[in-house]
């Protein structure tokens, strides 16, 4: 389509290359100079007068003014994978810088030698294995230490009482560290006394278990507390000849529990330990309980001939109340034993066979508790007790004696007894005051000779190192695992159908289990007084008494008459442990 448009006083001819002719307007796309006067093959005449109304904003485009092409989009220089890797790397670097500068701190500078020399000897610490000998010749890491120096030595200040109190934030520094008349003085602590409610609960549970076990084993002829007391009271080596057989008629283990309170830790002077030793003092009170023992016997007149006259005697002794102050302290292992807290010398010419025989003889006594004193040497003519045999076995087995717990009562204790007596056969005398005084004085002397200061009782602490031989499972899975042989510890539970016997299963390095019949009689063990060694050599409880220390008696109907005679021979050993009468056997679960 050609037309002439006056522009700035000149005539120019334009041609519309593209035109779209709707009913009321013309859409112009672009202009270019041309001489053609056709639009889509048809002649078209353009009216110049209509141009301003149709194209109010149209501007002429000359030949030298063409439309510029649109700018091309800039392509990224990195691909998507490269950008992802760069982003991940930057995040890792940021996290690493945060951990290094905000979480980890700088290494502390090495301690200066001037600071070490300025410290006193009591506060100087060892920073290496050879700190004493390597102050001027430090050892490099490439040097291999000797075998004896692998375990770091314990500083001498670690066992000091002041160091222990300082590290545990306990104020028990003695106000007057002097002694009087060569005896150690008890210094009061500035720390507030502590209540022992949690300790009372633990002690009550322990005593309740002892009472329950003693009642469970009441029908056993060998392991019951009745049999143990009868054997102890009728010991021919200690019972006088003018006393007939003593028969126990009544035993009551009580129903109440002792209450401990007002616990305080004090520092006590001890010339044999550096810095003294620590001692825990606690008040104990037991009242309104029913601890009683009743016996019957006869006094024999053996002159001018044996059994010339017989006088029946019945006694009943009850503990009405006991109160006192209990002292507890720990005794280091290398310098002590279960018999004395000082070194005990034995005759050099004493043979092993004689010692073993005396140990076996004294083991049968069982109930006699020897006197324990501080730094008291054992006489050369005294025979070792069962505790000494046990300690000797422990010393040979583990190399050094174990650490012990020493406990005693202060002299200001209170022990109230009630003694009832009945003397005579036909015309009886009841509750004779003189008899009550004699019995009460004898009981007081017996108690003071054993557990009243300065005499103490020393008990070896058990080994609490975790072992598979002592591993058990709580709940109802015990019996299932014992049958399947999964556990390696005797899992002992009481008999079900009215049975008082025990059953178990040995495993690992244990010494086998015990399984009793429905009545608890005929067991192949000596119950509460003597028990085979728990660490037998292969006693896995296969058949009766096979293996060292292993005893196994099936509780089935076909094996109810199998006693401990079949297994007592190989199961009994010379190092059997002595147990308190009425105490629980190993691993007895009461339901």
UniProtKB/Swiss-Prot annotation:
Main location, first listed in the record: endoplasmic reticulum
Domain of life the protein comes from: Eukaryota
InterPro entries: Mmm1, MMM1_dom, SMP_LBD
Membrane protein topology class: Single-pass type I membrane protein
GO biological process: mitochondrial genome maintenance; mitochondrion-endoplasmic reticulum membrane tethering; phospholipid transport; protein insertion into mitochondrial outer membrane
Compositionally biased spans, kind Polar residues: 146-159, 170-179, 336-371
Keywords: Endoplasmic reticulum, Lipid transport, Lipid-binding, Membrane, Transmembrane, Transmembrane helix, Transport
Residue intervals annotated with topology Lumenal: 1-83
Region ranges (Disordered): 138-159, 170-189, 334-398, 479-591
Organism from which the protein derives: Ajellomyces capsulatus (strain G186AR / H82 / ATCC MYA-2454 / RMSCC 2432) (Darling's disease fungus)
Domain SMP-LTD: 192-462
One Pfam family this sequence matches: MMM1
A GO cellular-component term linked to this record: ERMES complex
Protein name as annotated: Maintenance of mitochondrial morphology protein 1
Assembly mode: Homodimer. Component of the ER-mitochondria encounter structure (ERMES) or MDM complex, composed of MMM1, MDM10, MDM12 and MDM34. A MMM1 homodimer associates with one molecule of MDM12 on each side in a pairwise head-to-tail manner, and the SMP-LTD domains of MMM1 and MDM12 generate a continuous hydrophobic tunnel for phospholipid trafficking.
GO molecular function: lipid binding
Compartments where located: Endoplasmic reticulum membrane
Compositionally biased spans, kind Gly residues: 496-525, 536-550
Spans through the membrane: 84-104
Comp. bias (Basic residues): 180-189
Presence of keyword rRNA processing: no
PANTHER family tied to this protein: SMP-LTD DOMAIN-CONTAINING PROTEIN (PTHR13466:SF0), TEX2 PROTEIN-RELATED (PTHR13466)
Family listed: Belongs to the MMM1 family.
Domain commentary: The SMP-LTD domain is a barrel-like domain that can bind various types of glycerophospholipids in its interior and mediate their transfer between two adjacent bilayers.
């Amino acid at each position: 389509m050609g037309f002439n448009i006056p522009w700035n006083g000149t005539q120019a001819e334009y041609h519309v290359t593209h035109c779209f002719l709707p009913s009321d307007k013309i859409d112009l796309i672009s202009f270019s100079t041309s001489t053609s006067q056709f639009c889509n093959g048809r002649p078209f005449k353009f009216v110049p007068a209509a141009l301003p109304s149709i194209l109010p904003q149209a501007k002429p485009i000359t030949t030298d003014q063409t439309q510029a092409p649109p700018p091309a989009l800039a392509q990224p220089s990195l691909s998507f994978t490269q950008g992802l890797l760069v982003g991940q790397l930057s995040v890792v670097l940021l996290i690493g810088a945060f951990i290094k500068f905000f979480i980890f701190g700088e290494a502390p500078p090495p301690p200066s030698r001037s600071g070490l020399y300025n410290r006193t000897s009591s506060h100087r610490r060892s920073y290496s294995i050879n700190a004493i000998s390597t102050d001027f010749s430090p050892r490099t890491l490439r040097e291999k230490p000797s075998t004896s120096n692998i375990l770091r030595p314990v500083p001498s200040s670690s066992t000091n009482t002041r160091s222990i109190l300082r590290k545990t934030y306990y104020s028990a520094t003695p106000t007057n560290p002097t002694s009087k008349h060569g005896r150690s003085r008890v210094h009061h602590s500035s720390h507030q006394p502590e209540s022992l409610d949690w300790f009372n609960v633990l002690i009550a549970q322990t005593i309740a278990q002892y009472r329950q076990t003693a009642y469970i084993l009441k029908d056993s002829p060998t392991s019951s507390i009745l049999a143990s007391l009868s054997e102890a009271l009728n010991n021919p080596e200690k019972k006088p000849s003018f006393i007939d057989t003593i028969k126990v008629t009544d035993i009551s283990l009580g129903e109440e529990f002792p209450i401990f309170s007002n616990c305080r830790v004090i520092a006590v002077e001890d010339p044999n330990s550096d810095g003294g030793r620590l001692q825990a003092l606690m008040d104990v009170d037991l009242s309104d309980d029913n601890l009683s023992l009743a016996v019957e016997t006869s006094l024999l007149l053996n002159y001018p001939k044996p059994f010339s006259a017989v006088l029946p005697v019945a006694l009943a002794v009850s503990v009405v109340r006991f109160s006192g102050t209990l002292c507890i302290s720990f005794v280091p292992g290398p310098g002590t034993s279960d018999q004395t807290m000082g070194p005990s010398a034995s005759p050099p010419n004493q043979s092993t066979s004689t010692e073993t025989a005396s140990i076996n003889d004294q083991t049968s006594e069982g109930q006699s508790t020897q006197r324990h004193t501080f730094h008291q040497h054992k006489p050369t003519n005294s025979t070792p007790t069962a505790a000494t045999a046990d300690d000797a076995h422990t010393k040979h087995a583990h190399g050094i004696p174990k650490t012990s717990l020493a406990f005693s009562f202060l002299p200001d204790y209170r022990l109230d007894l009630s003694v009832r007596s009945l003397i005579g056969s036909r015309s009886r005398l009841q509750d004779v005051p003189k008899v009550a005084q004699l019995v009460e004085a004898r009981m007081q002397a017996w108690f003071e000779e054993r557990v009243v200061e300065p005499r103490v009782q020393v008990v070896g602490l058990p080994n609490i190192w975790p072992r598979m031989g002592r591993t058990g499972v709580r709940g109802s899975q015990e019996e299932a695992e014992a049958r399947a042989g999964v556990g390696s510890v005797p899992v002992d539970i009481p008999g079900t159908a009215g049975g008082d016997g025990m059953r178990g299963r040995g495993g690992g390095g244990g010494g086998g289990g015990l399984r009793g019949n429905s009545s608890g009689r005929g067991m192949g063990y000596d119950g509460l007084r003597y028990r085979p060694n728990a660490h037998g050599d292969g006693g896995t409880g296969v058949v009766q008494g096979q293996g060292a220390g292993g005893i196994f008696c099936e509780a089935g109907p076909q094996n109810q008459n199998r006693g401990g005679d079949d297994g007592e021979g190989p199961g009994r050993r010379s190092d059997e442990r002595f147990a308190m009468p009425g105490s629980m056997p190993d691993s007895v679960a009461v339901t």
